């Protein structure tokens, strides 16, 4: 009975507190890599868990929002056209953003569908995209 009362009070307090939108940083650990949709290096295809955890962002048809989790402080993004080659390699791609910190390009974000998180990384030597990965939200099963 005591546990039920505590649970009810907790639920009432949660309902009364103002709801703030949850940022992607708040849910940073709630996503796992579901599928690599493009990779130009064989080792990334083999390593299903290989990605740059510092570049995690959520994109939709109107904007690109992202959290840098301390490593990068001032990330800007620029919407760019998909090349013919990119459209062939990633046919699901609808919109592409280049991500920058100052003059340095960090990576790309590609919009493939609504409310899905994607990550990508650039090769530091030749500047080409290494992979684009689809992320899946982890849901807790009770």
Model-derived segments and spans:
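Positively charged n-region of N-terminal signal peptides that target proteins for export
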Residues: 1-4, 8
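C-terminal motif of bacterial Sec signal peptides marking the signal peptidase cleavage site
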Residues: 12-15
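N-terminal helix-cap/turn-to-beta initiation motif at the start of protein domains
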Residues: 18-32
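A glycine-biased structural micro-motif
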Residues: 26-29, 46, 52-56
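Contiguous, well-ordered beta-strand patches that form the walls/edges
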Residues: 36-42, 59-113
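Short, surface-exposed coil-to-beta transition loops
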Residues: 50-53, 102-107, 127-133
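Short, solvent-exposed coil/turn segments at beta-strand boundaries
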Residues: 55-64, 110-119, 137-141
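Edge beta-strand at a domain terminus
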Residues: 71-86, 118-142
């Amino acid at each position: 009975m005591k546990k039920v009362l505590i649970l009810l009070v907790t639920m009432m307090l949660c309902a009364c507190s103002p709801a703030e939108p949850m940022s992607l940083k708040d849910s940073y650990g709630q996503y796992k890599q579901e599928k690599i949709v493009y990779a130009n290096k064989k080792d990334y295809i083999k390593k299903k868990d290989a990605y740059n955890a510092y570049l995690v962002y959520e994109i939709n048809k109107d904007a690109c929002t992202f959290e840098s989790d301390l490593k990068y402080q001032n990330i800007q993004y620029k919407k760019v056209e998909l090349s013919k080659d990119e459209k062939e390699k990633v046919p699901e791609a609808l919109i592409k953003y280049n991500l920058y910190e100052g003059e340095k390009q960090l990576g790309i974000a590609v919009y493939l569908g609504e409310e899905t998180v994607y990550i990508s990384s650039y090769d530091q030597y030749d500047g080409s995209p290494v992979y684009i990965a689809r992320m899946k939200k982890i849901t807790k099963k009770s």
